[in-house]
């Protein structure tokens, strides 16, 4: 399978699984974002696509390509989300530590779950 097709499959899997988390956490995120920017969430879909391309490439390059264990996927996801969350907390006084912790853990779960699904159903 070509690398670009693999990354596209990874990206779609990540986005699909992440949708359920973001949807279930929408009230928390809506409140947080509105408190910080003074208006409701407004999505930039192009930026979102770029984000999932980067995440898909990272998961492929550092975990799936080398057939690393699920723990490596979990740690990579946690590190990526921890960097984002702690940077947000650094710049935004009202950024919640609750979101920092929840979203950091979710990053690990998302990457491990995506790796599991891809190996189980797509032979990665």
Task: Provide a role label for each language-model segment.
Residues 1-124:
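Juxtamembrane/disordered regions of integral membrane proteins
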């Amino acid at each position: 399978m070509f690398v670009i097709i693999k990354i596209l499959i990874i990206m779609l899997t990540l986005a699909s699984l992440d949708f359920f988390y973001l949807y279930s956490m929408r009230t928390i995120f809506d409140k947080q974002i509105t408190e910080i920017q003074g208006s409701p969430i407004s999505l930039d879909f192009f930026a979102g696509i770029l984000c999932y391309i980067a995440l898909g490439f990272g998961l492929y390059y550092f975990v799936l390509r080398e057939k690393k264990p699920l723990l490596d996927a979990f740690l990579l996801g946690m590190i990526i989300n921890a960097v984002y969350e702690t940077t947000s907390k650094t710049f935004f006084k009202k950024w919640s530590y609750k979101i920092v912790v929840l979203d950091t853990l979710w990053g690990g779960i998302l990457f491990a779950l995506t790796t599991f699904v891809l190996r189980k159903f797509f032979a990665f």
